[in-house]
Amino acid sequence: MSLEKDIESFVKSLDLELYEISVARDGDDSIYRVNVLSTQIEDGKKKGVSLDECVHLSRLISPLLDVTPPMSGEYRLEVGTPGIERKVSTLKQFVLSIGERVALTLKSKEKLKGLLLRVEESNIYLDVDAEEVCVEFAQISKAKTYFEW
């Protein structure tokens, strides 16, 4: 099994979904980031991920990384959420963002903002100004969730 699949199994054991694994640099430090989301609904909204859940997940993942280091050299493990406003770059991330507001930039340079309704195969469906709009995933050059204050 791959390292990502092993991490994903720990994430799922806590009733969370793996959103993204990334490597970042902060000066001389290397950071191995594991971002997770909750798919549970509470009071009609997606439930957040608690700090305790992130700590618990970090403690589950850390021994695995001691045995199978994700990169050479020293690194810091960070477990958290991708935030309210985050990039959306894979079909899985679109699925995990259903019910949230998204801003899309298409390859044609057209920009769309709306509520993400559903994902079917490689089509993304949005509610844009009370009209359902279908966008093919391959036509999206950039996407992110956004929060309306």
UniProtKB/Swiss-Prot annotation:
* Gene3D superfamilies found in the cross-reference section: RimP-like superfamily, N-terminal (3.30.300.70)
Can you list the GO cellular component terms from the UniProt entry?
cytosol
Q: Name one GO biological process term.
A: translation
Q: Where mainly found?
A: cytoplasm
Question: Which cell locations does it reside in?
Answer: Cytoplasm
InterPro entries, per the entry: Ribosome_maturation_RimP (IPR003728), RimP_C (IPR028998), RimP_C_sf (IPR036847), RimP_N (IPR028989), RimP_N_sf (IPR035956)
Which Pfam families does the record match to this protein? DUF150_C, RimP_N
Instruction: Give the keywords, sorted.
Output: Cytoplasm, Ribosome biogenesis
Cytoplasm keyword on record: yes
The keyword Transcription is assigned to this record: no
Family as reported in the entry's similarity comment: Belongs to the RimP family.
Function field: Required for maturation of 30S ribosomal subunits.
What protein does this entry describe? Ribosome maturation factor RimP
Q: Which organism is it from?
A: Sulfurimonas denitrificans (strain ATCC 33889 / DSM 1251) (Thiomicrospira denitrificans (strain ATCC 33889 / DSM 1251))
* Name of the coding gene: rimP
